[in-house]
A protein has these predicted regions:
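Non-heme di-metal
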Residues: 1-190
Length: 190
């Protein structure tokens, strides 16, 4: 079955490649931190990203959606560049920008769910929900890691993400069910 939804196809192809960039970035991030608990947590996030990539590819294959080799090259280079930069930009910035990135990624999976549902397809709801919630958990991990850093207010003012601002409306303390989660990220569902 082919999907007649160009936005969904584009989002799936981008998410597949962007997960590789994120995983590569977390390899560098984990390597650059000194505390063993931080290394373990970031390594787990890296593994989650590889898992998301595998799940997205499975969905793409189900609908005959080819991988974008342009995205693969682009995001490969982005991920490797970020990975290397983690060793030179200090402790705060990798945490900040990882959290900011994860905040936006939350909605990618809920928007995919919306697009599939627009086509009458609900079979991917559970896995897309789980990936969106996992991205939110990643966002919260990075957010809590820097919440008391003196640079956070400045970065939040400049880049629009931090303890007071998120790019999604998911609240882990009051999670919606899979069915009700269709209310998430409506601001991005355009």
């Amino acid at each position: 079955m082919n999907l007649d939804h160009p936005k969904l196809v584009r989002l799936l192809r981008m998410a597949y490649s962007a997960e590789k960039a994120a995983a590569f970035a977390y390899i560098g991030h984990a390597g650059s931190v000194k505390h063993p608990d931080e290394k373990i947590a970031i390594k787990q996030i890296e593994m989650d990203e590889w898992g998301h990539r595998k799940t997205v590819l499975s969905i793409m294959r189900q609908y005959g959606i080819p991988v974008s080799w342009w995205n693969e090259v682009k995001y490969h280079l982005i991920g490797k560049t970020i990975s290397l930069s983690c060793y030179v930009i200090g402790w705060f910035m990798p945490y900040y920008f990882a959290g900011r990135l994860e905040s936006g990624n939350v909605c990618e999976y809920f928007v995919m769910m919306h697009y599939f549902n627009d086509l009458g397809i609900t079979e991917h709801d559970d896995e897309l929900y789980e990936m969106g919630i996992k991205e939110k958990e990643h966002e919260i991990y990075f957010q809590k890691s820097i919440e008391n850093n003196r640079l956070l207010p400045l970065f939040e003012k400049i880049f629009g993400w931090g303890t007071a601002n998120s790019f999604n409306d998911v609240d882990l303390g009051n999670k919606y069910s899979v069915k009700a989660s269709k209310a998430y990220c409506q601001h991005r569902n355009k």
